[in-house]
């Protein structure tokens, strides 16, 4: 019985410790920067105009983690209604 109680307390301790450890890693990052990549797309306000691909790269680079800027990235800009653009960077390398 005593062994079971010690085992249970140890399991709970390690469970709490590991969840706090993973949360602490996220807190060390700048909250305005994204490590990014789930979809490689993001919606912004604006209009693509003649140079939408460069505009998308500039907008996305401003919100990405700096490690992504070292890779060669090309983006596509698609204009949507209500002054919205969809920026897509399919060849982006995720960390």
Swiss-Prot record:
It is found in: Secreted. Its main location: secreted. GO terms for cellular component: extracellular region. Residues 1-24 form the signal peptide. It holds the Pfam family SCRL. The keyword Mitochondrion does not apply. GO terms for biological process: defense response to fungus; killing of cells of another organism; signal transduction. Keywords: Antimicrobial, Disulfide bond, Fungicide, Plant defense, Secreted, Signal. Disulfide bonds join 37-94, 48-77, 56-87, 75-89. The keyword Cell inner membrane does not apply. InterPro entries: SCRL (IPR010682). Belongs to the DEFL family. This is Defensin-like protein 247. It comes from Arabidopsis thaliana. The lineage of its organism: Eukaryota, Viridiplantae, Streptophyta, Embryophyta, Tracheophyta. The gene is SCRL6.
